[in-house]
Amino acid sequence: MPYPDLYDEPTRSRRRPWWVKMFLVVVVLAILAAGGVAGVIWYVAQDLPPLNSVTAYQPSLVSRVYSDDRQIVGQFFVERRILTPLSDIPQSLIHAVIAVEDARFFEHPGLDVIGIARAGWMNLRRGGKVEGASTITQQLARALLLSPERTYIRKLKELFLAYKIETVLSKEQILETYLNQIYFGQGAYGVSAAAQTYFGKDVAKVTVPEAALLAGLPKSPNNYSPYKHPERAKKRQEHVLTRMSDAGFLTPRERDEAAAQLLSFRHGMPAQTAPYFMEYIRQQLMAKYGETAVYKGGLEIFTTLNVRMQTAAEQALRNGLRQLDKRQGWRGPLRTEDIAKVVASAPPPSDTPVKKGDTMEGVVTKVGKDHVMVQAGSIQGKLLFDDMAWAKRRLRGRDLARDVIVAPTVKGLLKPGDVIELAVKSVDRDAVSFELDQTPVVEGALVALDPRTGAIRAMVGGYDFSRSEFNRTVLARRQPGSAFKPIIYATAFNAGLSPATVVLDTPVVYEQEDPDKTWKPENYGKKFHGMTTLRSALTHSHNLATVRLLDKVGVKSVVDFSKTVGITSPLNHDLSLALGSSSMTLLELASAYGVFANQGFRLEPYAVGVVQDQAGQILGQNLFAPRQVISTETAYLITNVLEDVVQRGTGQQAKSLARPIAGKTGTTNDYTDAWFIGYTPNLVVGVWVGFDDIRSLGETESGAHAALPIWVDFMREALLQLPEVPFEIPENIVFVTVDAATGLLAADHGDQSTVEIFLKGTEPTQSAPPRTDSTRFYQIDQGIDGIGELPAAVQP
């Protein structure tokens, strides 16, 4: 039998122990796992976005618009964000955010292992996800660099990016970027916009309880909104205060005191200031700088808008249009509803009390002999007949410019179930009295300019921007009627005529190209005034005298002069120009009057003075350069005559302002347009009133009746900001006593004489004949159609 090999071991002794096998398995698995992790890391690392969005942080910023006294009056934005340095953010807000979002922010390298473990334990104990573990740096990486998808790969990318961010930015830089980036709800991005949105204050003035409220919002802005869910918002604020106390930022006493304070929230954003003006400059900015710069570039836009004047302009126009609309009569109830249903569905009394002037809809519930009862929401009130008597019906007469007025009765106006517009007249304890109201359908516009600079101080392009965004100050071309006449008379003065030059205001017929047609202009009221001076003709707005003057001065001369003073709209090249038949915008006509107010110097109207980028670099600036386009003497001559329009003519209502004022009314055929353009040495203001669809405003609704009251109401407030200064008299203007009827030297200084102004060298040298000399009328009639020989410079 063979001997066993001494070197052979038993089979059992050659088997590896189990722990060796286990060790080998673990090693292999570890290698595989490490390889897998390395592969995942490699894969994730290959697809990481660059850090440019973080290291060169350029968020979408609000472009802010400022008034002439540096008040913020508007904003343009995609995301309402105001970039704020960390040094300008109060410590209480910084502490609140850190405490609730990432208490170990200054201790970890971008991902917080301890925080992850704590959050996992808390979630395990409470049986669900009640606490997150994302650090501030992770949230920043997610917001700036990653898509919103919820996948494990995205989470890994978030961790890697957070670590990388911590290697290139300081903790302070990360925190500043985060506080400017995060969304707080209500359209507010970043802490500054959030402070303005919720509390209406600068972020630097935020208190501890307010800071805690804000810090609790980013987790879920909708769920913790103090407007939608006040109880949840309060609990969230208390949670933040507790975390601040746990982190050592507050003592327990400070925490309790902060939690006990009542917060006052800003309810709704304020109504946009000067919406027509804002849209006007927005279009200009978009054309010059582009959409990205305007809506995301954080531009600082300094405008010419005067807030007090703008407010006065809006109120004056709205009040004037409402009064005019009521003069036109009532258009009837809005609709009819079932009274029982209205009363049954009336809401509970509101915590907000009504006040005088508030407007609302109401339903007529009962009709009496001299009053009606109305239900307006939760309010029951009375409407007396005297407070609805304006609601007369207007019946169109045969003459398109005339209406027949029919007086109303209560039962003739209203019946139960009628839905009507109401305005609160008075509130006496629990009793509310109403007056019948009506939203105007008539439109209007007002623009105010500083003639010395061209700066637009106020602009209202219509009754209500939300109803119509069409800006009637710059887009609506309408016939100015007699408001154009000063340009014709200024052309004559510029050519050497004087306010004392006489002209015949008598019937005249002009042949047209068609031999079967003639044109016969008429005066307002169909009256004639015979021989009259240019001063009197313009003061009293005589059409026939103006047509004769235009005929002799020359249409081309007036058209050229119009362009010189700023009229850019095309003008009719015929004698109808004398009656203001050529359409133009309110802004261009007001700007033309500004040349008269500014002693012959023209400046282009402008609304934006300076535009800066977010770093303060000037991108654009209005460097206004005045150009003298007519002589100082011509400007004063026309101004002096237009002062007479206010003192003795169609603009007499403006006398109540007791300031040096010049101006002119304008009314077109059938009262379709009403104008008043007036000025002082430091402000020129134009008002237009009319329907968009060009129809009559009604009989008597002339410029003096429809537009001038609005102008006066505005100027009463606007002039409070401006010093009283006289119109400066040029050296070459001389004063001469003349005969009021003929414009010649007065034979005596009795009642028939007046002091007139002349450009030196144009004053009369011939004395007026005795009034009994009837041959004088024959002599005048033998002149050039009632004006006499014109200077050579203006011979047609």
What kind of region is each of these model predictions?
Residues M1-Y66, R104, L124:
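N-terminal type II signal-anchor transmembrane helix
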Residues G128-I379, L549, K556, D560-T564, ...:
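Non-catalytic, structured segments within soluble enzyme domains
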Residues F277-A293, G444-Q479, A490-T491, A597, ...:
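Active-site beta-strand/loop architecture of penicillin-binding DD-peptidases
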Residues V97-I98, M244, A313, K369, ...:
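Active-site SXXK
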Residues L262-L263, P270, L305, T564-V629, ...:
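Active-site-proximal helix/loop microenvironment
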Residues F106-I116, Y189-S192, T251-E254, F470, ...:
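Short, well-structured active-site flanking segments
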Residues M1, H267, D338-S350, K366-D370, ...:
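Soluble, non-transmembrane domains of envelope/secretory-pathway proteins that act on or interact
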Residues R125-R150, A204, A271-T273, R452, ...:
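Conserved catalytic neighborhood of penicillin-recognizing serine enzymes
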